[in-house]
Amino acid sequence: MSGHGPAQPMTARRSGPLKGRAEIPGDKSISHRALILGAMAVGETRITGLLEGQDVLDTAKAMRAFGAEVIQHGPGAWSVHGVGVGGFTEPAEVIDCGNSGTGVRLVMGAMATSPLTATFTGDASLRKRPMGRVTDPLALFGTRAYGRKGGRLPMTLVGAADPVPVRYTVPVPSAQVKSAVLLAGLNAPGQTVVIEREATRDHSERMLRGFGAELSVETGPEGQVITLTGQPELRPQTVAVPRDPSSAAFPVCAALIVEGSEILVPGVSRNPTRDGLYVTLLEMGADIAFENEREEGGEPVADLRVRASALKGVEVPPERAPSMIDEYPILSVVAAFAEGLTIMRGVKELRVKESDRIDAMARGLEACGVRIEEDEDTLIVHGMGRVPGGATCATHLDHRIAMSFLVLGMAAEAPVTVDDGSPIATSFPAFIDLMAGLGADLAAG
């Protein structure tokens, strides 16, 4: 079983101006998908810039367990010798996906239409997260799932021996659910159709096309209609993974709120389905310039030049939530340093992430002297242009909560401690060194 070592408290103190280049790790969403699609292609896929956080390493291990040869050649440089669509072999061991909701749900989708059985588990946080939202649509293909009460891990999936194509409307915007259904559809005959009422991040669609799948996206009265033709032969690719906009959010937001800062963040994905935070920050008055805009691996990228800014509160519309679902914790920190109310609506999905992120941010911000209002679906931050700080904040084993409160401490009047900084390694292992290199005052304990 996945475990968790001793807690590693960390403290951030008010920092001088942040200066320099922030080299962000590769995008987590694209890294997971590159490994999985590489394993389902016939031949060798080469990947550069792969994120080597624990979540992605767990997906690499899972692909090995299903029979693909996954080799690391150097930092970020990997190759995957795929076994083809329908070529997975039954794993001999339990598949441990650690902390990764994305990893477990995508891998479940990838194996769901093969005639084999696999058992999945994860760490204490992942074992609390509901899997029914993925196993319900997979059941339509003929997959059977046996999990703990409430559809939780550990869970055994019995893949469909004779899968049927599926037409599925995603009930709650979720790129993970959409992607799991599309990956399952690869080994089903005929056409699998996924309907989204609200668009979510589209890395799976872009990458499936890149690997040679026949996939179309049309807008109809029901929403976005994605049609995938099953049982293609996927062709191996060379994948250059752009830098992760969700990880870039932390140094970007730190530079906005730490007085006198100016940083450059090169090569960040500007995928429009992931751009909600940057749209919101610009509305708040952030000084962010997008330089050297270009395309890499089918994804738009740019270098971000960020300067400290006087910010004002804004209302974030609910329809923006899918394009920034992982960024609300750090946005709520920025909102605390803005002048006026920031109202974030349509955020109930945050309650079933690695932690209940609305509750975790609300309690931590209140402890730091910020006035908060919340209900099931809304978070309101009363920005005062300054934050007293001086608190210890609970991270609930959630990497984004940990990084958000450390950024808060860099600009607060008194130091801010997080009870455990170790989960940061799941998505951004170099976060502490990177921020310290820019001038942040961070220390263990």
UniProtKB/Swiss-Prot annotation:
Metabolic or biological pathway: Metabolic intermediate biosynthesis; chorismate biosynthesis; chorismate from D-erythrose 4-phosphate and phosphoenolpyruvate: step 6/7
Keyword Iron attached: no
EC nos: 2.5.1.19
Catalytic residue positions: D326
Record's subunit section: Monomer.
Gene3D superfamilies: Enolpyruvate transferase domain (3.65.10.10)
Job description of the protein: Catalyzes the transfer of the enolpyruvyl moiety of phosphoenolpyruvate (PEP) to the 5-hydroxyl of shikimate-3-phosphate (S3P) to produce enolpyruvyl shikimate-3-phosphate and inorganic phosphate.
Family: Belongs to the EPSP synthase family.
Chief subcellular location: cytoplasm
Disulfide bridge positions per record: none
Residues noted as binding phosphoenolpyruvate in the record, renumbered to the chain: K28, G101, R129, Q176, R357, R400
Alphabetized GO MF terms: 3-phosphoshikimate 1-carboxyvinyltransferase activity
GO biological process: amino acid biosynthetic process; aromatic amino acid family biosynthetic process; chorismate biosynthetic process
Domain of life: Bacteria
Catalysis: reaction(s): 3-phosphoshikimate + phosphoenolpyruvate = 5-O-(1-carboxyvinyl)-3-phosphoshikimate + phosphate
Gene Ontology CC terms: cytoplasm
Catalytic EC class: transferase
Coiled coil: none
Pfam families: EPSP_synthase
Residues binding 3-phosphoshikimate: K28, S29, R33, S174, Q176, D326, K353
Protein name: 3-phosphoshikimate 1-carboxyvinyltransferase
Entry keyword set: Amino-acid biosynthesis, Aromatic amino acid biosynthesis, Cytoplasm, Transferase
Gene: aroA
Organism listed in the record: Cereibacter sphaeroides (strain ATCC 17023 / DSM 158 / JCM 6121 / CCUG 31486 / LMG 2827 / NBRC 12203 / NCIMB 8253 / ATH 2.4.1.) (Rhodobacter sphaeroides)
Region (Disordered): 1-25
Location in or out of the cell: Cytoplasm
SUPFAM superfamilies: EPT/RTPC-like (SSF55205)
